[in-house]
Amino acid sequence: LHQHGVIHRDITPANIILARDGAHLIDFGIARIWSASSNRSRDTTALGTYGFASPEQYGFAKTDARSDVFSLGRLLGFMLTGVYPDASDYEQRLADDAAVPARLRAVIGYACAFEPSKRPQSVQEFRQALFSQSNPPMPNASSANPPSTRTTNGSASASRLFRRLHLSKRAIVLWSIAGAALIIAA
């Protein structure tokens, strides 16, 4: 998508469908064409789904691939917690070591840094941080989702996690496959 100059600007669970050949991103209604040589200094309309849209989408700043990286970070947080990012208990669930291992929380914090320059600069860089064995760079205090300072002694068992999220195993697997497919396909 980005290699073709398209910025989606509305990556949410509702805009992902699963098909036999994998996960697909749909609803390009607010997508825009972007290029490095574009003379557009800012977007003029606040668009995107609240909770998933990047801060620059609401601050009338220029959006680019890093805006979609922010949304992917929020999508990952949703997949791990089962709670939408605009819910009152999202941050609490995200900070729960039993639900979200510290390393994944750090990846989410990195992707969701308030300043675009502090985020992965591309979906490929986000994918590398997600699948790397080392910890991603830690965002500074201006991140949208500061990672918890608590440590973890390992991730919870799958059955305990499913019970905590009140989601079926099928739903967890489908969301995980969809998210991973989108990240890998990018």
List the model feature ranges, each with a label.
Residues A99-F114:
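Conserved C-terminal C-lobe helix
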Residues D68:
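Conserved catalytic-loop aspartate of Hanks-type protein kinases
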Residues L1-V6:
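Protein kinase catalytic-loop region centered on the HRD/HxD motif
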Residues R119:
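Conserved HRD-motif arginine in the catalytic loop of eukaryotic-like protein kinases
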Residues S41-E56:
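Conserved activation segment of eukaryotic-like protein kinases, specifically the C-terminal portion
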Residues N15-I26:
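Conserved protein kinase catalytic/activation segment
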